[in-house]
Amino acid sequence: MLDSRAGMATILLCGVDLLVRSKLEALVPGHRFETSDGVEPPDLVIADVARLDPDDVADRFPDVPIIGFTNHTDTAGLRRAHAAGFDQVIAKSALFERGPEVIDRLLASVE
């Protein structure tokens, strides 16, 4: 749940490897990154669609903004995430370039 006093959000990482997690933590400091479901619902989900079924992720978190990413060559995965209703679908390289602005924009929509 977004802690508006501290500006800290809980971001659930689904299917995300350790390298991606550490890059995201460095790019977007001040938020709590989780890799498993906690008691509280997350404020945002970031999912690697190469490792997970986008429909399953969207079904589990219908009221939470979702960012899906995969390699830029996985156009089928990007299309599946878009069709599943993800709020943002992005290539992995673009996630690291534009991630902070995308995350901030989606978190602002839940405040």
Regions found by a protein language model. Give the residues of each.
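Alpha4 helix (beta4-alpha4-beta5 surface) of REC/receiver domains from two-component response regulators
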Residues: T73-D87
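Short acidic low-complexity segments
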Residues: F33-P41
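A short, hydrophobic beta-strand element within the central beta-sheet of small alpha/beta folds
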Residues: V64-T73
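Output/docking surface of receiver
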Residues: S36, G85-P100
